Amino acid sequence: MQARHLLSAAALSLAVAACQPAQQEPAKPRPPVILIEADAPPRPMKPELPPLFDDIERRTFQFFWDTTNEINGLTPDRYPSRPFASIASVGFALTAYPIGIENGWVSRNQAIDRTLTTLKFFRDVPMGPQRTGKAGYKGFYYHFLDMQEGRRYDSWVELSSVDTALLMMGVLFAQSYYDGDDPREKEIRQIADTLYRKIDWPWLQQRAPLISMGWFPESGFIDHDWMGYNEAMMVYILALGSPTHPVSPDAWTVWTRTYDNDWGVYQGQEYLSFGPLFGHQYSHVWIHFRDIQDAYMRERGSTYF
């Protein structure tokens, strides 16, 4: 727990009064005690943004808040049709709620309730190898779930490593953000830890040390592994950091070696290439990669930022 000091507003009033002529005044109620976070860093100031940016931020938050099922916390893959929920969308929604708090668009209590509902759903939903009636297996979840029941949406829906990672990044973000002593915030942290610990990452290493894109109960493991620079960076990071089912460090080493065909040059500047913008954005939503280098990027004289 951080060191905290209590500063009485009454003491400040007395100090000011001592510098002024004494006057007879009627007794006043004692001001409330002010709690000061002594060693907490100052809150960063939100930069001034063009009105368009502010509008995009607000609308993005509102999409997740307004379209998510309040009963189970599931967020649709698309709108307005909302045929099914995406577990990746849920990860982004869990991240959006604190942004709403920080901007004053929802209260902390509202966001806590929504987040706790979501995490309880993923903790309690049926899991197993069966083709129907389940939301996931081995700690991983199906890419698309029925919006109401939260079960696998259809037979073409895979148990997805990267979408589970996107969900889990939101879960772990919630665990970090809700750091108060409120019993509900403590429960958020506990459930988040439980969900992360359940994921059996080595199970998807059918061609170790690389990690497969997923699994179907009908046909088994997907034949393709995560290779080349892309959004799967967070898959390997989560798998390496697992407190219960970690993959070995050579998973990262071998994965980065698959970058070799992904380099390009623009105006004399060498860069790590991946066409779709989301491949560069997704992992960076939650991890600040500035000045971080692994052995591979150090050899190239580059970074991920």
Identify the residue ranges that each predicted region occupies.
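Extended ligand-binding clefts on enzyme/binding-domain cores
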Residues: 50-51, 131, 135-164, 177-305
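Membrane helical hairpin/interfacial module
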Residues: 84-91, 95-156
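Short glycine/serine- and small hydrophobic-enriched flexible loop segments
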Residues: 94-102, 169-176, 239, 284-289
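Bacterial N-terminal signal peptides that target proteins for export
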Residues: 1-10
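Second-shell loop/turn segments in exported
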Residues: 43, 47-51, 80-84, 101-106, ...
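C-terminal motif of bacterial Sec signal peptides marking the signal peptidase cleavage site
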Residues: 16-18
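Hydrophobic core segments within long, regular secondary-structure runs in both alpha-
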Residues: 53-65, 94, 112-123, 168, ...
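Low-complexity, Ser/Thr/Pro/Gly-enriched N-terminal "stalk/linker" regions
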Residues: 21, 29-85, 127-140, 240
